[in-house]
Amino acid sequence: MKKCWTIPPAANAAFAAAMEDVLAVYHRPFDPTRPVVCMDEKPYQLLGHVRDPLPARPGRDRREDNEYVRSGTCSIFCWVEPLRGWRRVDAQPRRTRVDWAHQVEHLLTVDYPDAATVVLVMDNLNTHTTASLYEAFDPAKAFALAQRLEIHHTPKHGSWLNVAEIELSALTRQCLDRRLDDLAVLNAELAAWQQQTNSNQRQVDWHFTTDDARVKLRHLYPTTQRN
């Protein structure tokens, strides 16, 4: 038996530096002019039924045939402002640099048009850079959007530091526990989950601090070399 796990590197200065940077961001006070937003994305396989499922009835769960039809793949984008209890999720056919850039444009012009700066926490996927903005928009617009971002990357093998990844896990359990074979249907389900979750304004109160990390995760820090 085995489990797949994200194992951080031991005694790694780059990991420790990025981890402490993100932890410091999470402990900033709430500031609507500089909201802290986390983002993540995940691939999703659209699946259809070969045979109609048998509905649940007293004493018997719903039954699905183990054979299915692949209906393509897509990517689910998730944006979370932990201190406000706000989420935005939607699925797109692709996850290219241009797709990410248009997601950022929506974030800055629709979700946060009045924020001076959006503090963005995400992993260091190659599409997650301001260079992607220049592939999607003219230089003036790309520069203007980039100037409103303050980007902080989680360390490699440190996905547990991304609140948006935690939210995607919750979304998967609560909303994606059955087969969906159409992008429009998937987006309708995501919109319903988003509306319900946002109406509850469930905030994320991050307790783990840099002081905690230096004690509980001290094996991740390199040995200090002093002259």
Segments predicted by a language model, with ranges:
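Active-site proximal helix-loop segment of RNase H-like, two-metal nucleases, encompassing DDE(D)
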Residues: 87, 164-183, 196-200
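C-terminal domain-tail junction helix/linker
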Residues: 11, 50, 185-227
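Extended, low-complexity cationic-aromatic segments
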Residues: 19-105, 217
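Acidic/histidine-rich, metal-coordinating catalytic segments
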Residues: 115-129
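Short, basic/hydrophobic alpha-helical segments
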Residues: 98-119
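Mobile genetic element proteins and their domesticated derivatives, centered on retroelements
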Residues: 38-40, 79, 85, 104, ...
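RNase H-like polynucleotidyl transferase catalytic core
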Residues: 63-68, 141-163, 180-181
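RNase H-like two-metal-ion nuclease catalytic core shared by retroviral integrases
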Residues: 74, 123-124, 151-173, 184, ...
